[in-house]
Amino acid sequence: MSIYVGNLSYDVTEESLNAVFAEYGSVKRVQLPVDRETGRVRGFGFVEMGSDAEETAAIEALDGAEWMGRDLKVNKAKPREDRGGSRGSFGGNRSNNNFRNRY
């Protein structure tokens, strides 16, 4: 399971984020999505810790904490399928049904 880290400074690096979370245990992976057009960090990231206990400790300590001039939003990351409706399938299914009903 991963940790979602939001409201990050655009100056953050994977190394600096790793250092903050390393205070709460072993960091397995840090991911900072980048904007395709600008190449700039998008203001959020994901951190994977060594154990659930380490994740819980990091979330409890860092959620709402100020870092690099920003108040962090830190919680368990939701799997892609649980984050809400996907954009692609919603419109596609509806148009196929309308086509069948008309002809």
Curated annotation (Swiss-Prot):
Domain of life: Bacteria
Keywords in alphabetical order: RNA-binding
Location of the RRM domain: 2-79
Pfam families linked to this entry: RRM_1
Composition bias type Basic and acidic residues, residue spans: 74-85
Compositional bias per record (Low complexity), positions renumbered to this chain: 92-103
Annotated stretches, region: Disordered: 74-103
GO molecular function terms listed in the Swiss-Prot or TrEMBL record: RNA binding
InterPro entries (alphabetical): Nucleotide-bd_a/b_plait_sf (IPR012677), RBD_domain_sf (IPR035979), RRM_dom (IPR000504), SLIRP/GR-RBP-like (IPR052462)
PANTHER family for this protein: HETEROGENEOUS NUCLEAR RIBONUCLEOPROTEIN 87F-RELATED (PTHR48027)
Protein name: Putative RNA-binding protein RbpB
Naturally occurring in which organism (per UniProt): Nostoc sp. (strain PCC 7120 / SAG 25.82 / UTEX 2576)
